[in-house]
UniProtKB/Swiss-Prot annotation:
This is Brevinin-1Ta. It is found in: Secreted. Belongs to the frog skin active peptide (FSAP) family. Brevinin subfamily. Expressed by the skin glands. The keyword Ion transport does not apply. One of its GO terms (biological process) is defense response to bacterium. The keyword Secreted applies. Disulfide bonds join C11-C17. Keywords: Amphibian defense peptide, Antibiotic, Antimicrobial, Cytolysis, Disulfide bond, Hemolysis, Secreted. It comes from Rana temporaria (European common frog).
């Protein structure tokens, strides 16, 4: 599963980490 990449992608867009 690629949850880390997905979360990183969302983090980059929403600026919420």
């Amino acid at each position: 599963f690629i949850t880390l990449l997905l979360r990183k992608f969302i983090c980059s867009i929403t600026k919420k980490c």
